[in-house]
Regions:
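N-terminal Rossmann-like dinucleotide/flavin-binding domain of flavoprotein oxidoreductases
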Residues: 32-91, 167-171
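Short, glycine/charged-enriched secondary-structure capping and boundary segments
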Residues: 14-15, 36-39, 111-115, 152-155
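Short, function-defining helix-loop hinge/capping sites that tune catalysis or transport
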Residues: 21, 33, 108-110
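N-terminal FAD cofactor-binding segment of flavoenzymes
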Residues: 5-22, 48-55, 61-62, 100-101, ...
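FAD-binding core/adjacent interface of flavoenzyme oxidoreductases
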Residues: 66-135
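Glycine-centered flexibility sites
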Residues: 2-7, 39-42, 48, 102, ...
Length: 171
């Protein structure tokens, strides 16, 4: 379950091991708002959607692979493996199940933030920090670890932690 980088990587290794593979993809990868992906040799700076399309094309050359568009809405252990329910009402049976659906970002309700997400409002300095090096950076406190994030991104530029009124951990 998951048709972005992690799910496609798992599917490739399974296909090369001659396993039957069905990749279920809801079509909403975490990096869908970013224009470029970084940190992959041979792919650095490439559009994530282009990378996914190329990976899918490579995978579909293996005769044991199929891609299924849709969202998995349930998964349950059954005799002999798993039963996966899909949003279109179909049910699939599988001997093994790889959960590679990643993370969903929950954005604070701040006017204008969603439109900048993945472009100038970012979640990961390792993914996007280099392109913003030397600029003034900010971290919006949304959880206790936000102070740690502000200390972390200070390596990329002058950083301000914007507090939301909740406590900042001493450590």
């Amino acid at each position: 379950i998951g048709g972005s980088f992690a799910g496609l990587s798992a599917a490739l290794q399974l296909a090369r091991a001659r396993r039957t593979v069905c990749v279920i993809d809801a079509g909403a990868p975490r990096n869908r708002f970013a224009d470029a992906s970084h940190g992959f040799f041979g792919q650095d700076g490439k559009n994530p959607q282009t990378m996914i399309a190329e990976a899918r094309a490579q995978l579909l050359r293996y005769p044991t692979v199929r891609m299924l568009e849709g969202a998995a809405t349930s998964a349950a252990a059954v005799a002999g493996g798993f039963e996966v329910g899909l949003s279109n009402g179909l049910t699939l049976d599988a001997a093994r199940l790889v959960l590679a659906f990643g993370i969903s970002d929950v954005l604070p309700e701040i006017p204008g933030l969603a439109g900048r997400w993945g472009k100038s409002v970012l979640h990961c300095p390792y993914c996007h920090g280099f392109e913003f090096s030397g600029r003034r950076l900010g971290v919006l406190q949304t959880m206790p670890m936000s102070a740690h994030q502000a200390l972390l991104i200070a390596d990329w530029g002058s950083t301000t932690l914007f507090l939301d009124g909740s406590d900042v951990p001493d450590s």
